[in-house]
Curated annotation (Swiss-Prot):
Function: Hydrolyzes ribosome-free peptidyl-tRNAs (with 1 or more amino acids incorporated), which drop off the ribosome during protein synthesis, or as a result of ribosome stalling.
Keywords from the named record: Cytoplasm, Hydrolase, RNA-binding, tRNA-binding
Protein's name according to its UniProt entry: Peptidyl-tRNA hydrolase
GO biological process: protein quality control for misfolded or incompletely synthesized proteins; rescue of stalled ribosome
Gene (name only): pth
């Protein structure tokens, strides 16, 4: 069993924001496994389930807003009894250039409030797929920056990163994590 979480904020107003690239990527991956999301209030999320070669896949989009993502993650993790090494979190990262992807296990939260929330509840030794959204230009506030929509040009670059993750996601399912990591460069 594997738990794949995309971080973002619920609601139409956040749908195409930089902070929601985790939701966007997760939806793209889930589509590949012919599943759709439904609201599960007891888990504080939208959830989709599928199987691949006998392995159950659970896709989660927390509905708690970014800063409380851990509440949803712990609810699903506990219910399904999923170990940390089978948890993958997809999220935006302002410390990476737009469209760059990094895969890592464990580590700090880099100031990301969604990761802070998760780390505060389940430890931090889970896998992360970090998608670069870049830093704000000039003196723009970081919160305003990540809560703004991508420009059309930026969205094309973000979609290319999402496609790269989706096209290689089977490597994660096959437990070829180093190979997945090398393909993200």
């Amino acid at each position: 069993m594997m738990l794949i979480i995309g971080l973002g904020n619920p609601g139409k107003e956040y749908e195409h924001t930089r902070h929601n690239i985790g939701f966007i990527a997760l939806e793209n991956i889930a589509k590949q496994y012919e599943t759709s999301f439904s609201v599960k209030k007891k888990f504080h999320c939208e959830i989709a389930e599928s199987t691949n070669n006998g392995q159950k896949l659970i896709f989660v989009k927390p509905t708690t807003y970014m800063n409380l993502s851990g509440k949803s993650v712990i609810a699903v993790k506990t219910y399904y009894n999923i170990p940390l090494e089978k948890i993958f979190v997809i999220h935006d990262d302002i410390d990476l250039e737009l469209g760059k992807i990094k895969f890592k296990t464990g580590g700090g939260n880099g100031g990301h409030n969604g990761l802070k929330s998760i780390d505060g509840i389940i430890e931090n030794n889970y896998h992360r797929i970090r998608i670069g959204v870049g830093r704000p230009q000039n003196s723009q506030d970081v919160a305003d920056y990540v809560l703004n929509n991508f420009s059309k040009t930026e969205y094309v670059i973000a979609e290319q990163a999402i496609d790269k993750i989706t096209d290689n996601f089977n490597l994660i399912l096959e437990n070829k994590l180093e190979e997945f990591k090398s393909k993200m460069v």
